[in-house]
From Swiss-Prot:
It is found in: Cytoplasm. It comes from Erythrobacter litoralis (strain HTCC2594). This is Argininosuccinate synthase. It is an enzyme of class 6 (ligase). GO terms for biological process: argininosuccinate metabolic process; L-arginine biosynthetic process; urea cycle. Belongs to the argininosuccinate synthase family. Type 1 subfamily. Pathway: Amino-acid biosynthesis; L-arginine biosynthesis; L-arginine from L-ornithine and carbamoyl phosphate: step 2/3. It catalyses: L-citrulline + L-aspartate + ATP = 2-(N(omega)-L-arginino)succinate + AMP + diphosphate + H(+).
Length: 404
């Protein structure tokens, strides 16, 4: 890859990206800029600065940024307006974080005069696709370096040996250890590898880091309310909150009640099936609540159309097409549908469950007068149903006469 002198690396401070940072310098002769994003992963990020400094990277080329509000406001909430779940289950916690990281990688490359960006995603997974599609959409001329697709460090042992040779500190719990891949942000935590690679084996409880076992959750339910305005959450139990603060508070409630665990075998974009364990405590509560407020504010046609669009929208995010015109077209339609999605949802949190038990809205389409089993005082003429049924039955009658 010619004409590259400086590269911006998506840097976590962990062993893999520390090796990559040094490898880019030693093997490729590049000047390295590191970028570490705080997306609410719950880790202290200043050690990443110290590790970068220890490798000789100057302070002006070390970027650590708090992106939590931008992440939830501009990525998570728009996705939640669509009720997006990949393959019906996965709330896309890893997928939705990649576009923002890629955006800042490209921007920092432009700010620092770098010729390329680099990431630590492997050649087997989805993240390489997500990072690179996003980067190319934002800067068609950017160059991307993906060391896992290039180098000969094909085993954990080889990686550790290379790290030790170049004076990179190796944590004791990494020595001789097979990869156990984790990802975390304010929306979720995911785990893959090791015992999870056998889809028949139940996920051991020690793998879960973000939620209590539902069996050990409180024996008494907890009731909460979430207020929505035009499809976005704005308050918890009547207290106004920013997007990131709202999700943080819901995460704690979900953790306490064991909500949001998902054991999933999914279809990766690159073609293989993989098994992952996901914890999305606050996101699961929020998604249930959003669905609840839509139930009384969305017209049937709009609601059903949204449900038809959702799988495609979720697939686009999963596959890395956040910055594509088709995702933006779908987003425009979804956002338009949210104009009247305002009100309050009450939920019951209990031993792994988040159940909607009440909803109200000034824009409600629910008419108790029409649905009551008591006297509706003429609100609905039941005899009208006869003609409705007759018209809808016409084609079925004609088919029946022909085929039966």
């Amino acid at each position: 890859m010619p004409d590259i002198k400086r590269v911006v690396l998506a840097y976590s401070g962990g062993l893999d990206t520390s090796v990559i940072a040094k490898w880019l310098e030693v093997e490729r002769g590049l000047e390295v800029v590191t970028f570490t994003a705080d997306l609410g992963q719950g880790e202290e990020l200043e050690p990443a600065r110290a590790k970068a400094q220890a490798m000789g990277i100057p302070d002006k080329h070390i970027f650590i940024e708090d992106l939590r509000e931008e992440f939830v406001r501009d990525y998570v909430f728009p996705m939640m307006r669509a009720n997006a779940r990949y393959e019906g289950d996965y709330l896309l916690g890893t997928s939705i974080a990649r576009p923002l990281i890629s955006k800042r990688l490209v921007e920092i490359a432009q700010e620092t005069g770098a010729d390329a960006i680099a990431h630590g995603a492997t050649g087997k997974g989805n993240d390489q696709v997500r990072f690179e599609l996003s980067a190319y959409a934002l800067d068609p001329d950017i160059k991307v370096i993906a060391p896992w697709r290039e180098w000969d460090l094909t085993s954990r042992t080889a990686l550790i040996a290379w790290a030790e040779k170049h004076q990179i500190q190796v944590p004791k719990d990494k020595r001789g250890e097979s990869p156990f891949s984790t990802d975390a942000n304010l929306l979720h935590t995911s785990s893959e590898g090791k015992v999870l690679e056998d889809p028949w084996e139940e996920t051991p409880d020690y793998v879960y880091s973000r939620t209590v076992n539902p069996e050990d959750a409180p024996d008494e339910p907890e009731f909460i309310t979430i207020d929505f305005e035009r499809g976005d959450g704005i308050a918890l139990n009547g207290e106004a909150m920013s997007p990131a603060n709202l999700l943080t508070a819901l995460n704690e409630l979900g953790r306490k009640h064991g909500i949001g665990r998902l054991d999933l075998v999914e279809n990766r974009f690159v073609g293989m099936k993989s098994r992952g364990m996901y914890e999305t405590p606050g996101g699961e509560i929020y998604a249930r609540a959003h669905r609840g407020i839509e139930q009384i504010t969305l017209d049937r046609g709009a609601a059903h159309l949204k449900d038809e669009l959702m799988p495609k929208y979720a697939e686009l995010i999963y596959n890395g097409f956040w910055f594509s015109p088709e995702r933006e077209m779908l987003q425009a339609a979804i956002d338009l549908s949210q104009d009247k999605v305002s009100g309050t949802v009450r939920l019951k949190l209990y031993k792994g469950n988040a159940d909607v038990v009440g909803r109200k809205s000034p824009n409600s389409l629910y008419s108790e007068a029409h649905v009551t089993f008591e006297d509706d005082a003429g609100a609905y003429d039941q005899s009208d149903a006869e003609g409705f049924i007759r018209l809808n039955a016409l084609r079925l009658k004609l088919l029946g006469k022909r085929d039966r």
